[in-house]
Amino acid sequence: MLIFKTKQMKNLKYLILTISSLFLLTSCDRDLDINPEQGIDTETAISTPEGIQQILIGAYANTGDGDLFGGDLQIYADLLADDSYLYWWGTYAELGNIHEKNIISDNVYVRDTRGRAYKVINATNVILENLSVVKDADDKKRIEGEAKFLRALNYFELVRFFGKQYEAGKNNTQLGVPIVLKTVTDFNGDLSVARNTVEEVYTQVIKDLNESIANLPEENSFYADAYSAKALLSRVYLQKQDYTNARNIANDVIENSGKSLMTNYKDAFNTSENISEDLFAMQVTSQSGENDLITFYADEPQGGRGGDISLTEDYLNLF
């Protein structure tokens, strides 16, 4: 299985590269609006292999941000679930609106999640358009594979949260989300982009993942590798109810990735390092302030707000 969970890694230091001209249609009321000292201009960043690699690391960091896999995507999935599964005790009105299925256009959580995802997509587009500066053939393939994996991952979440539902066996011409495959650097003009169909978005996601699989190595430290991309592709096919492809690709991962499930389920969580069943895990630290899973699920001694989200007894009794 593909696991997107946070890691409380005590000594992990990851680089968040902010490129001043790559902010896309979003600002965050919960963050200070400052120019980071580490920021560099786009032309400098894309002029060397090291710069391209740093943009890629920044794309990972943004994907693991609290707006996305650092907590909010998981929180939305819970809050949008059947009310019989959980309670929302929190005081954040915007999250309460999501739980009530009454989301208005200026919901800052929704805005920031969408904006953060497109920031990652824009960064991956920058990388893919400037791969020529990477001269080492193996590095070039790997970087292309990782960029397309991250782009596919973010589009898959965007279309599921912001597009209409995929309907198996139909044309799926219902509206999905805008597909943007070229770098945006000028944010002063009209940035509106028409929405693509759900079918078009899924087609792009599958294309990116197949190309990612072809380029990624089978092992790649804690970054995405070929089996990460295969596992995500299996999940995409499962969402499409293409069970044959989902099964075949999942079996490939199970049989060949070298990964295995933990003997004790609870040992898969609250670990200080990646574990045997992690095909891909976001490297999110509790110290970085980006771990919204801790904020809204954990008790106060663990750094949370006391449990804004809790499960119902009826749901717990199912286990």
Language model features with spans:
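Bacterial Sec-dependent N-terminal signal peptides
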Residues: 1-37
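Membrane-proximal, proline-rich intrinsically disordered regions
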Residues: 28-78, 134, 306, 315-319
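Aromatic-residue-lined binding/catalytic grooves and analogous aromatic/hydrophobic interfacial grooves
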Residues: 29, 210, 227, 232-260
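Hydrophobic-face positions in mid-chain alpha helices that act as interaction patches
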Residues: 54, 84-86, 93-96, 206, ...
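Inward-facing hydrophobic residues that define packing positions of alpha-helical scaffold repeats
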Residues: 56, 121-124, 202, 209, ...
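Alpha-helix C-terminal capping/termination sites
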Residues: 64, 157, 161-164, 239
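Conserved, well-structured interaction surfaces
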Residues: 93-162, 196, 214-219
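Short coil/linker segments at helix-helix boundaries
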Residues: 161-199, 203
